[in-house]
Swiss-Prot record:
It is found in: Cell membrane. Changing residue 150 to A: Leads to ER retention, protein unstability and arsenite sensitivity. Gene3D superfamilies: 1.20.1530.20. Changing residue 151 to V: Leads to complete loss of metalloid transport function. Its main location: membrane. The gene is ARR3. Keywords: Antiport, Arsenical resistance, Cell membrane, Glycoprotein, Ion transport, Membrane, Transmembrane, Transmembrane helix, Transport. The keyword Kinase does not apply. This is Arsenical-resistance protein 3. PANTHER family: ARSENICAL-RESISTANCE PROTEIN 3, ARSENITE EFFLUX TRANSPORTER.
Length: 404
């Protein structure tokens, strides 16, 4: 057997060994709290539903009617909704945003990401929601609202695990955070009512004002608090102490606030949820399809956009091709793995905290829209963990441009 054949035959075994190691590394990259998140969400829902069914007096404890409220949401629930959004915002490097825009590749990737996140993403989720929930208007609206809410912070975790470009990811997260203040209201009305031809109980102008106010309160308040906490803490304590002590204290409150919010919702709605569990579970279909389609569509697009259009350069001639015989993508070897991963996970992720907060504010904590919005994080964490593992598995099978 020739040396080339020996080298070629050794590639699969090496790749398989790398894959097994990468899978374990990917899983270990998450904290045990992150890994337990799907189970703790399910446990919170089960306990709340049991309380709702067997303690009927609990169902109206958190209703806005007859209690102090903000934007139609009871104060106890409002506190939970705001608390769960502050920690992700505190993790974003707001103080460094001006440095990144000087890099030409970031400006180019930002334009592509805006198109994927604000045009393709909501369209894809709307199409999938209609496909699976054609006869379930309220659940469909809740799923569409998840699609309109683009991810602002959780993607930082997935990007780091998959080996994405951290600088690019920070720019995309900050840009999406600011754009959501402006775009969420018109897009929610457009996809939930205008193109869906769903009946409006009020005028377009009044509905727009309600959605815009809800976004201003339930994104604006935590956004402002999060930025003040980060910038103030960095000034007083320094970056090292902030990340070592302050951020470590703040981070768990995102999931504490989220689980508390889930608990309240299912106490209010749990008894009805049991009777409609079949139609509610249908919400899983568009969400699961969205995560996988969005991720692999972006992966394929990033490879396609890197294909050389020159007649004289049809295939890769870099050193990697000489070393790896059995690889794919020789014509698209200009693709960067780190940039591709950042685009894939930014496209596949959603801001489930915002969609849940707005659903509660607009339709009430006992609405089907709010129930549908709770399924986002239940599915997003395990599926994106799977996709992070898939990214590690796919990497050795493709040639990548590592110059960045």
């Amino acid at each position: 057997m020739s040396e080339d054949q020996k080298s070629e035959n050794s590639v699969p075994s090496k790749v398989n060994m790398v894959n097994r190691t990468d899978i374990l590394t990917t899983i270990k990259s998450l904290s045990w709290l992150d890994l337990m998140l799907p189970f703790t969400i399910i446990l919170s829902i089960i306990i709340a539903v049991i309380i709702s069914v067997y303690v009927p007096s609990s169902r109206h404890t958190f209703d806005a009617e007859g209690h102090p409220n903000l934007m139609g949401v009871s104060i106890p629930l409002t506190v939970g909704m705001i608390v769960m959004m502050i920690p992700p915002i505190c993790k974003v490097s707001w103080e460094s945003i001006h440095k990144y825009f000087y890099r030409s590749y970031i400006r180019k990737q930002l334009a592509l990401s805006l198109f994927l996140n604000w045009v393709i993403g909501p369209l894809l989720m709307t199409a999938l929601a209609w496909m699976a929930l054609f006869d379930y208007k309220e659940y469909r609206q809740g799923i569409i609202m998840i699609g309109v809410a683009r991810c602002i912070a959780m993607v930082l975790i997935w990007n780091q695990i998959a080996g994405g470009d951290n600088d690019l990811c920070v720019v995309l997260v900050i840009t999406n955070s600011l754009l959501q203040m402006v775009l969420y209201a018109p897009l929610q009305i457009f996809y939930c009512y205008v193109i869906s031809h769903d009946h409006l109980n009020t005028s377009n102008r009044v509905l727009f004002e309600e959605v815009a106010k809800s976004v201003g309160v339930f994104l604006g308040i935590p956004l402002g608090i999060g930025i003040i906490i980060r910038l103030g803490s960095l000034t007083i304590a320094g970056k090292s102490n902030y990340e070592k002590y302050i951020l470590r204290f703040i981070s768990p409150w995102a999931m504490i606030g989220f689980h508390y919010t889930l608990f309240v919702i299912f106490i209010s709605r749990g008894y009805q949820f049991i009777h409609e569990i079949g139609s509610a579970i249908l919400c899983f279909v568009p969400l699961v399809l969205y995560f996988f389609i969005a991720w692999f569509l972006t992966f394929a697009l990033m490879r396609y956009l890197s294909i050389s259009r020159s007649d004289t350069q049809r295939e890769c001639s870099c050193d990697q091709e000489l070393l790896l015989k059995r690889v794919w993508g020789r014509k698209s070897c200009e693709a960067s793995f780190s940039i591709t991963m950042t685009q894939c996970f930014t496209m596949a992720s959603n801001n489930f905290e915002l969609s849940l907060a707005i659903a509660i504010s607009l339709y009430g904590n006992n609405s089907k829209q709010a129930i549908a919005a709770t399924f986002g994080p239940l599915l997003e964490v395990p599926i994106l963990l799977i996709l992070a593992i898939v990214a590690r598995i796919l990497k050795p099978y493709y040639i990548w441009n590592n110059r960045n």
